[in-house]
Amino acid sequence: MLADTVTYKPVFVDPTQAIYDTLIDQVASWRLPPAMERYILRKTKTIKPQFHAIPKVHKDPWTLRPIVPSHSWVTTTTSEVIDYLCQPLLKQFPWIVNSSKEVINQIEKVRTLGTEPIWILTGDVTAFYTNIPPKPCSKMLGKIWEVFCKESSISSRAIKQMVRFVMDNNFLEYRGQTFHQMNGLAIGTACAPVVANLYAAWYERKARVCHQNGVLMYVRYIDDILCLFQGTALDAKALCENLKIGPLRISWSHSLERNEFLDIEMLRMPNISPRVLHTRLFRKPMNRHLYIPWSSAHPSHVKKGFVKAELIRFAIICSTYEYFADARKEFYGNLRRRGYPAQTLEEWFKQVTYDNRQALLVFRKKDESKVPLMLSGHYNPVWDYVDVKKVITEARRFWVKEELPNALQEPLIRSLGRTKSLFDLMSTWNKTVLLSISDIAEEG
C-alpha cells in the first residue's frame, strides 16, 4: 500500500519541527477564541503516527483499510478544533445520517408518487477519505462556513487554513521510515468524518439530488449512499451517472426487489401500499456472532446492557413483528451457544417488546448544556458494594462549603474499563519481537 507513490511519498528528513513551527506561526492569525488557541498551543504533541492497515475480509478479493492513528501528532489539536466547530454544520444537510434509526425513520415516511417501479439504489464512494483533494476541500469548507456561519467571530479564511494545515501535513511512520500522505484525509485524524461529510454534502446540495424528479429518499452515511428512486431503469441509471462528488468514484448497486444498507435489508414486495418497502435485520455472511461469553468477567449489567441494546436495534430495524421474532430467535440461539443461561435470557428478553417500536423510533432531545461527572476506574467486584449516590452526596456537601461551580451538581456516572491482561502484555511483547526480527532480516 505504501508503494503507491501517488498517495504516499517517502521522506528522508524529519519534518516534525518544521511543521510545529508552522503551526505556532499560523495559530495567532486564525483569531480563534482564547480557550481554543490555548488548547492548540499547550496540548500539541509531536509523536508521528504509526501506520498500519486493517484487512477488509468481507471483500473479494481482500483489500486493506489504511489506518493513521493521529492522536498525538502536530495536527491533532487543530483537527479536534475543526471537528468541534464543524459538527453543527451537519444539521444543514439533513440527508447525512448517523445511525440506522435515522434511516428507518426516513423510510417510514416515504410514499410513492405513481405507478412506476421503485428502485433501491445503494452507492459506495471508493476510498473516500484518501481521495479527497486538500486544496479544493479546504476552499469548500471555507465556503460552507461563510454561508452558514456568517455571524461567527471565526472567519471562513481561518477554517480554510486550518483544514489545509491538517490535510497538507499528514505524515506517518512505518518501520522507521517516514512517509507523507500527499492526498486526502488521514483515516485516524479527528476531523476526518465531518470534513469528508461536508465535502460530499456541498456537491450533493449543488446537484439538488434530494429534489430531483423521482427521488423518494436520499441519505448518506459517510461513504455509503441509499436512494429510493421511482422511475424507469434508464432514469435510475441516469441519476447514478450524473451524481458526482468531485473527483471521487461511486460504485452503484440497484434492485427492484432487495438491497442492503448498513445493517438494514430492504425488501420491495407487491401490494404493500402505502408502505414503500419492508425492512429487516441484515447480517454479513462472515458474521460469527462472537458476543461477550457468559464466562467473561464483565459485570452482569454490562452483559444485560448489550443484550437489551441489540433487541432494541432489532425492533427499530424490523418493519414487522415476524421479522423481529426471527432476529430475536437467532440472537437467542447465538447467546445460548456463548454460554448464557436460558432463564437469564428469558428475563432480559421480556424487557424489550415489539409493541414499543413507535416509541423507540422517537429521538429524545439531549440537553447538551449538561455534562455528567465521570468516575473512571476498572472493572472490579468491589463496585458491587459501593453506593455511588452516597459517594456523590457526601462529596457535594464539601463542594457547597467551598462554593464550587454548579456543574458539579450533574449526576455521577461510573466509567469503567478492563485492566491490562496477560494477553495484552503478550501481544505487545510479540509485536516487539516480530518487528525486531523483521528489522534484523532487512539489515542483513
Could you say what each language-model-derived stretch is?
Residues 1-444:
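Charged structural interfaces that engage phosphate-rich ligands
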